[in-house]
Amino acid sequence: MELYYNADGRIYINPEIKNWYEQFIGDKNRPFHILDGDLPLGKWFSEKRSPLLSDSDHAIHTVSSGRPYGLEPDDVGELARHNIHLHLYGDYTQSFWSHWIREAREVAKDHLHLHSYCKPEDWVQEYSQYDAGWLHLFRSDNYGELLRCKWDDLNYPARMCTLAAAGLPMLQRNNNGHLVAAERLIRKLGIGVLFNNIPDLAEQLKDQHALKQVRNNVWTHREQFTFDHHAQELADFFQQVIASKKILQPA
């Protein structure tokens, strides 16, 4: 907090974080910039999309590119009953979540699939075969009050960029009525599926026309999730901060 208070320029990952900090740092007149700190290089955002698995087996295939944050084994079982598959990536994730995986397999049968870590250069080709990808699932309880916000409310999960690269609709629980940064962005760009429960999610995922539109929206906006897209604006911001502090030398 002291660092932000004394900084000549401030960078925030999103407007919600900015508003949260400004409750405490007071001085709102210094230069600021909005930029997510986890944006990958644009070179990973290739055009090599794969055919959808669902086109061949007529099931729904979802992916978690990291830990299944907020998903319980029983949720995976309920997904399976709606013929929705979960593909879980990451060797470390599978090791750390081994007990969770055992429980999920007991109730999901053939609907839980484990995959090794996917390198950034393979994001598009690997993940684009799925119908949608999971963000972080949680129930917000801030009721629109900044002081009640938790990190889940204010955070942009890093996997948003991974899913955007592959053009995948993003799955997140509907926390309408609360301040949730990722949900605001999803609604603004039309890049996700916000659901109240698993049956609601299943119904939305099986609406192929609507899901295709969301997928197209993600592909349209995916460059916004690269660092390259924002590099010039960041450089301009640095120049703005320097100019605001420039001391004229005596002649």
Report the location of each language-model feature.
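Short, well-ordered alpha-helix to beta-strand connector turns
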Residues: 6-8, 83, 130
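Conserved catalytic-core segment of nucleotide-activated headgroup transferases in glycan assembly
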Residues: 39-128
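Nucleotide-sugar-dependent
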Residues: 118-165, 171-180, 184
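A charged, aromatic-enriched C-terminal amphipathic alpha-helix characteristic of glycosyltransferases
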Residues: 196-246
